[in-house]
Amino acid sequence: ATRTRGALTMGTPVPESGRTMDRDDAGYESARRAALWRTNVPQRFPDRIVQVSSIDDVVFAVRAAKAAGQRVSVRSGGHSWSGNHVRDGGVLIDVSRLQAFSVDASSMTATAEPGIGGSVLLAELMKRGLFFPVGHCRGVCIGGYLLQGGFGWNGRAFGTACSNVIAIDYVDADGDLRH
């Protein structure tokens, strides 16, 4: 099934577990407000909010937005004082549901999706005698934290979070998954 509204077509690659909302859909305003951790929500309104549940959802949402000539912004945890990810027009891709992670204690590495909170990841790492310099505020997700450089309280001792990353898998502006 394909759903078209306002020049952006979303089809079956967005699974039942994901959710797509246009401005006039039920749940849009609560999703827009929930895209920020603070209560002072800017008066900016994306044309569509896509709450993804998989990397495939992200790929599809980016490709659909590109095909429609729409700008894309991304939210992982919404811990942005300015709320710069909530823009007028375009598509807001909410990756906060992407919270899977795995830890390989023998190689001292972890793999984590962008919606996992740094405090959650750190707690799991510490159970295994490992550490990662996460943000100092509870609820800061690693996706946005890393995009901002990963500056936290432990930076002087351990470096920025970005300097502790071995590799990143990401979806580029064309909607292609890269490593």
Spans of features found by a protein language model:
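N-terminal accessory segments
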Residues: A1-F158, R178
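Active-site and channel-lining beta-strand-loop segments
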Residues: F101-S102, T160-H179
